[in-house]
A protein has these predicted regions:
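Hydrophobic, aromatic-rich transmembrane alpha-helices
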Residues: 181-212, 239
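Hydrophobic/aromatic-rich transmembrane helices and adjacent perimembrane loops
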Residues: 221-254
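Perimembrane helix-loop-helix junctions
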Residues: 107-133, 193-200, 237, 243-249
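Short periplasmic/luminal acceptor-recognition loop of GT-C membrane glycosyltransferases, typified by
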Residues: 105-109, 287-340, 346-370
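Transmembrane-helix motifs of polytopic, lipid-linked glycan transferases
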Residues: 11-35, 39, 46, 70
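Membrane-interface alpha helices of multi-pass inner-membrane proteins
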Residues: 86-102, 108-115, 132-138, 210-219
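Specific aromatic-rich, kink-prone transmembrane helix
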Residues: 23, 64-81, 86, 93-94, ...
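Membrane-interface transmembrane helices that cradle and orient dolichyl/undecaprenyl
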Residues: 71-88, 116, 187-202
């Protein structure tokens, strides 16, 4: 392997983003008309694509949204013409969305609740059929997994034990939420204000969709900025309705508020267009300084390892594996995984001290940042030697 292409990832993100915008426009047109759909698409493709919530990245939220929004469109078709096929399609697409990102149940949950809410007992059977269809791809994935235990842990147990709003201290989760609010305000504020302009005309299905998307963001617990991407499609739908209402009723005062919010969004975003890539990375990813040195580190790794050899990036920066074309020597590639999964740190130590150590250890983070006991540092001191420092990043090779 010669390494992955960042340009390929960007192109795929652009295609996925365009698909989500297009399908959201169709959903909006079916629920509210062409003018709201046009406004929803424009809003989603501009302010909804805010860099502050990392909307330009090929995130799990973006990829899952392709399936989630498509599932809602299938459900809208079912409401227009109650053919069971559309209901089953909505369920299957919901299941696919959840397989991409466990939090991407929002559209499917909104559809199921909508059926019961509006049809009472008559909605129970179709809602059950939708939910049953959603489980089909999930069951297939579980049945075909190499290890059902590992699959179950990755899909269910990990979140339940280590990483959700229900784990950790309430104070810590509240602090993380507060830290994410500035990015959420800059990324979603204008959309939310535009949506509020037409709140009296919001369709129940759109309200439920936004509600479940918000619940999914909160449920993740860590409040990473990219979590908020999940709220963009339902907010865009409601923003399209709000924008159409402003045009219809000529609400000058509210239009002025929205205009100020849009201007503020442009004001804080436009400078990034003219910044260098490193400056952009510092602004958008302040907690990931390795992004500014990854290119140099990747060149070194490629030059000093062969395809087929394994490396270990300590403790995070999984992009280095992809960009260098070298496989990881350890199964967990994110800081939080090793920090939160019981026994993961011990497994990492055993891997480093084992008979087949990685060809290189890239010290993106210090050993003590994960292991203050000093045991990982002692393994590096006795089993490895520092062979280079690339852009401030120490690199070790086995002795």
């Amino acid at each position: 392997m010669d390494g992955g292409s960042a340009e390929a990832l960007r192109a795929l993100a652009a295609v996925a983003g365009a698909l989500v915008v297009a399908v959201t426009m169709v959903v909006t047109a079916r629920l509210a008309g062409r003018i709201p759909a046009t406004i929803a698409g424009l809003a989603m493709a501009t302010v909804g694509a805010a860099p502050f919530i990392e909307s330009f990245t090929l995130s799990g939220e973006l990829l899952a949204s392709v399936f989630a929004v498509a599932s809602l469109l299938a459900f809208v078709f079912y409401l227009e013409r109650p053919a069971p096929g559309w209901l089953i399609a909505a369920g299957l697409l919901t299941g696919c969305a959840v397989l991409v990102k466990q939090s991407a149940f929002d559209a499917g949950a909104a559809a199921a609740v909508y059926l019961v809410w509006t049809r009472r007992r008559g909605g129970v059977a179709p809602a059950a059929a939708l939910v049953a269809a959603a489980f089909v791809p999930v069951v297939i994935a579980a049945a075909t997994a190499q290890s059902f235990h590992d699959w179950w842990y990755a899909m269910v147990t990990y979140r339940d034990q280590a990483d959700s709003i229900l784990t950790g201290s309430f104070h810590t989760r509240l602090h993380q939420a507060r830290l994410s609010l500035p990015a959420a305000e800059r990324g979603l504020g204008a959309l939310a204000l535009l949506a509020l302009a037409g709140w009296r005309r919001w369709p129940l299905l759109g309200v439920l969709w936004l509600g479940f998307a918000t619940l999914a963001v909160i449920g993740g617990g860590n409040f990473h900025n990219h979590y908020y991407q999940q709220m963009v499609p339902p907010l865009a739908l409601l923003a399209g309705i709000g924008g159409a209402e402003l045009l219809r009723r000529r609400k000058v005062a509210w239009a002025a508020v929205v205009a100020i919010a849009l201007a503020a969004t442009v004001f804080v975003t436009a400078p990034l267009w003219f910044d260098s890539p490193n400056a952009q990375a510092r602004t958008i990813f302040p907690d990931d300084p390795h992004l500014q040195t990854d290119a140099q580190v990747v060149r070194y790794v490629r030059a000093h390892t062969r395809p087929g050899q394994h490396i270990f990036v300590m403790w995070a920066a999984a992009d280095l594996y992809y960009l260098s074309g070298r496989d990881p020597s350890f199964r967990y590639m994110w800081f939080r995984n090793i920090q939160a999964i019981p026994g993961a740190l011990g497994q990492a130590r055993r891997m480093l001290a084992g008979k087949r150590p990685p060809a290189l250890v890239v010290g993106i983070n210090s050993p003590a940042s994960m292991d203050p006991s000093g045991r990982t540092q002692r393994i590096l001191d006795t089993r490895f030697r520092k062979v280079a420092t690339v852009a401030g990043v120490p690199i070790y090779a086995p002795r």
